[in-house]
Amino acid sequence: MNPYQYTASIKEFFSTDENYIIGFLTQSNAFDSRRTTIASWKEEINTLKKALINYRGENGFVAFEYTIPRVDGRIDCIIGLRGILFVLEFKTGETQDINVDKEQLMQYVTDLKNYHFESYDIPIAPMWVVPSADVPVARVIRPVTNENIFGLMCVSDSTISDVVKKVLTSEYANKIEIYANNWLHSPYCPTSNIVEAARKLYANHKVEDINRSDARGEDLIRTTNAIISLINQAKARNEKYLCMITGVPGAGKTLVGLSVATLHQNEEHTNRSVYLSGNRPLVMVLQEALARDARDRSKDELEKKLASIEDKKEKIVYKKAHKVNMTDIRSRIKQFIQPVPNWRKEYLKGILVSGEGEEASFVKDLNYQYKGEGEYYIPYDHVSIYDEAQRAWEAKENASYVRKKEKHLSNFPEWSEPRFLISCMDRHPDWAVYICLIGNGQDINHGEAGTVEWIRSIKHFDNWQTFAPSDILHDKEVAKEANGLKINFLDHLHLSTDLRSMRAENLAAFVDAILCMRIETAKGILPELDRYPIRITRDLKKAKRWVKVNARPSERYGALASSKGQRLKPEALVLLPANSSETEVIPWFLGDKSNVNSSFYMEDVATEFQVQGLEIDWAVVAWDADFRYSEEGWKQYQFRGSKWMNINKEEIRRYQINAYRVILTRARRGMVIYVPEGNNEDHTRKSEFYNSTYNFFKQIGIKEI
């Protein structure tokens, strides 16, 4: 099926009767063919002919109703001429600017530039066309970044030809030839951010619909299909599997987990999946984003239904009976996206400890009076998906927590969180699958057990089989623990490519080279990040201005820092607390530009604890004196009282390095690293604390703003 409704060369367009063109446009049921729409098409055709009258004999093409593949967007008109791609949005019969629609147009342009293969190197000129408006000739806003996207130009039918002429005579024209057939049928490679992806998955899209169509996207699809195949196999054979999925930051592990969870949400009870995460901010943001999206879709469906009801009384009754209830929506979503503590607490109910030490086990408390519905002892879900499973608690941390919180389990044995969670799924009499999504080098807090604990725990369950990529053996501790354990190695369970930074597949490697101080490696990778701008500055105002200028209207930007960066406060950068509440996290990620608590204000600074597993488009990464460059290696500090203290404990040092790994890989489109000048009058912010780090980044070759 063609992605457009009508296309022709410019020569053919001028020689074709407008009624013939409209006939093509009305043939498809996908578009409205009401009289008002036909009138709008006529006005668009006439305006387009006015714009191109001086180019009617040139090579070029036009296309109407171009559908952006898999993005649910449709562009009114495309013009390819003299190496320039014009993207036109018409507001026929209107004279008022509508900012929301303008943002949507710029989002379409950004999508084309980033995901549409044939548009990568083509200058794109977006035009907001109001044919009947009385507007002066628009100023042509030339591209200000290396993306080659002109600023939005607002035109009427009387000014469009002059604006087109200015663009076509600019220095950006005639540098590349646009072949109509190649462009119209170009591969499309979208990579949604995690919130957008979750929304689409919950709305019954498949992972193929929201992922890139190139080899890197196929990697994600293969992993998803491999997991689905294992689930079906476990069910068919009445077996129990532990499946481990590994991957670099941003490779799509969360996307795989959400895909599996949403795939089974409407199926019978025996196939239900639950998505779990110990990352509270991630859960809060996903739950709220999905709830808002579901509410909006429900309202749209209700309005459509009400429009079809003519009787006023019947309409009132129907509206009352089908009122959109946000509480109910949130409740449904929380059934399949849950924080780990909530799920764990549910299955700590009604159990008793039998035996002691290594002989300890759990049994059902036959005297327990369960007040809920259904079975409390056996998990409702046959498939459990633990995102960021490397952050599960070690034995002492888990046992201590349970003993304090659950009075009936004061004798809870020293079982790690992985061991207890697997034991819960082991209560199923038939089959079960536990899926661990593991981020390499992303354990960031005290008490987190790491990948090795899952290997150690599964040894206690002889009736379970383990599936994992051979990549897990790169960790020496894991390899040692896995010795003697039969693991079914499936390399499709490893995701090796960063999809978050869609213009920089080597970003993870670049960040790793920085943190490991492999300077020559970092220098070698940096030129490969030409489509992912990285800058450095010592001026916070410049840093904020840079992300604002680069960000498109629909893109999110914000400030990030390490949680140990406690002396950024004098720079008016306030770190969000590690245990942030919903009122802090949700506005930061989902609030719009009118919300002072949103990321856009760059006053509240998110740390690794808020952003791990999530992402923004552009980031100001504030680099404090907690992590200082020296020729001997990174010097690591934490702020205690009124001074910086050396971090000597290896575990804490690793957490801090991973914190910087997280914040340096959160931005999908680009970032600027802000290194303060310091203040020699403040003993906690001396210039010498910062200068070596700044010079290190300059040495690598990162450009200054």
Where are the model-predicted features located?
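Accessory nucleic-acid engagement/destabilization modules that flank
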Residues: 1-190
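N-terminal pre-P-loop "Q-motif" helix
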Residues: 194, 199-202, 209-241
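Hydrophobic anchor at the beta1->P-loop junction of P-loop NTPases
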Residues: 245
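Conserved lysine of the Walker
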Residues: 253
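Conserved helicase/translocase motor-coupling segment
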Residues: 257, 444-448, 470-625, 629
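Conserved RecA-like ASCE ATPase "motif II neighborhood" in helicase/translocase motors
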Residues: 318-425, 603-607
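Signature of the SF2 helicase/ATPase Hel1-core->accessory helical subdomain module
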Residues: 385-481
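C-terminal accessory regions
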Residues: 430-433, 599-705
